[in-house]
Swiss-Prot record:
It comes from Wolbachia sp. subsp. Drosophila simulans (strain wRi). This is Succinate--CoA ligase [ADP-forming] subunit beta. The keyword Magnesium applies. It catalyses: succinate + ATP + CoA = succinyl-CoA + ADP + phosphate; GTP + succinate + CoA = succinyl-CoA + GDP + phosphate. Succinyl-CoA synthetase functions in the citric acid cycle (TCA), coupling the hydrolysis of succinyl-CoA to the synthesis of either ATP or GTP and thus represents the only step of substrate-level phosphorylation in the TCA. The beta subunit provides nucleotide specificity of the enzyme and binds the substrate succinate, while the binding sites for coenzyme A and phosphate are found in the alpha subunit.
């Protein structure tokens, strides 16, 4: 689960990470009534969306007066912000964060993420803050260091001294920030905390000028206070609907809807669709315990996307029985009067019974025995 920048800063502030003082606004009038609480000659006005690249897209402005800040907020509210992370359709700005300006001496990058190879958190630090860290890694890899940590290992600050020639005082302050975000990471079951930039001010303080936090969806049941931060306006409505039925759904830009059981098989299915010259419209994993009702809801979610011109169902029956899936497919197809081409490939537990159910349904369902054959058939139907 993602949250907004202003929410991430509120979380970090609770764990003693310094952040600029600010407030969130949904209208220019709110700025007029709240801006007096900020003790600054300049104000930073930031559009709040769940995507990076806001600055380049015009979503971050420096205001030199309260009146200018008010005007920036007025301009931003309701605008559609298109960044490299939003896709071409962009995201509508519904909230704006106004904060005190900071006197910046130097910008750094600091994040805490899960390393999939090590299966534990690692710190990433760079002297090139305020930039896309992927670009830094590509163009200046020597300016990035990683700190492998576990519960028995402290933050190895010696790497900061040897790699970036920081003073003992700077290292101590950065180490304190790192320890505080580690505490926040563990306490909230986060999957990522990113401070970019971590700013050293002219007075020598270190503050989080921007912050991003992602949380582990599987641990949200333990954190009702974090669930309250969820902004459904920032999420894809189909993904929200899918979560209600225990389905894992990610919307994509293609024309072939996919219904698969298992994340690995789902990715392989999308790959082979691309291999045969088409694009998947979604990732949809129905899991190992799907019922007829779940399958019906999965079809509804897939077909709610107007770009879908055909559907490929690829099921390998292990825990899940193919006859149950087949019954669900038939029931859903009849209930919804599915008009787009439908290719179904069943393999595994009770697959013969499943194929018989499909054949005797009287519906125009195209059967396939192999994944490659199924992909070619649906691509041919769509094209």
């Amino acid at each position: 689960m993602n949250i907004h920048e202003y929410q991430a800063k509120e979380v970090l502030h609770k764990f003693n990470v310094s952040v600029p003082k600010g407030f969130v606004a949904t209208s220019a009038e709110e700025v007029k009534t709240q801006v007096s609480q900020l003790k600054s000659d300049v104000f930073v006005v930031k559009a709040q969306i769940h995507a990076g690249g806001r600055g380049k897209a015009g979503g971050v402005k420096l205001a030199k007066s309260a009146e200018e800040a008010q005007q920036f907020v007025k301009d931003m509210i309701g605008m559609t912000l298109v960044t490299h992370q939003t896709g071409p359709s962009g995201q509508q700005v519904r909230k704006v964060y106004v904060e005190e300006g900071s006197s910046i001496k130097k910008e750094y990058y600091l994040s805490l993420v899960i390393d999939p190879k090590l299966s534990r958190p690692i710190f990433i630090f760079s002297s090139e803050g305020g930039m896309d860290i992927e670009e830094v890694a590509k163009n200046s890899p020597a300016k990035i260091v990683k700190f492998d940590i576990d519960s028995a290992t402290s933050f190895d600050s010696s790497k900061l001294s040897s790699s970036f020639h920081l003073s003992p005082e700077q290292i101590e302050k950065i180490t304190n920030v790192a320890k505080n975000i580690y505490d926040a990471f563990i306490a909230t079951d986060a999957s990522q905390i990113e401070i970019n930039p971590l700013v050293e001010t002219s007075s020598g303080d270190f503050i989080a000028l921007d912050a991003k936090i992602n949380f582990d969806d599987n641990a949200l049941y333990r954190h009702p206070e974090i669930m309250e931060l969820r902004d459904y306006d920032e999420e894809v409505k189909e993904e929200i609907e899918a979560s209600k039925y225990g389905l894992s759904y990610i919307k994509m830009d293609g024309s072939i809807g996919c219904m698969v059981n298992g994340a690995g098989l789902a990715m392989a299915t999308m790959d082979i669709i691309k291999y045969y010259g088409a694009e998947p419209a979604n990732f949809l994993d129905v899991g190992g315990g799907a019922s007829k009702e779940t399958v019906t809801e999965a079809f509804k979610i897939i077909l709610s996307d107007s770009n879908v011109k055909g559907i490929l169902v690829n099921i390998f029956g292990g825990i899940m029985r193919c006859d149950i899936i087949a019954s669900g497919i038939v029931a859903a197809a009849k209930e919804m009067s599915i008009k787009v081409p439908l290719v179904v490939r069943l393999s595994g537990t009770n697959f013969e019974e499943g194929k018989k159910i499909l054949e005797e349904s009287g519906l125009n369902i195209i059967a396939a025995d192999e994944l490659g054959d199924a992909a070619q058939k649906i691509v041919k139907e769509v094209k």
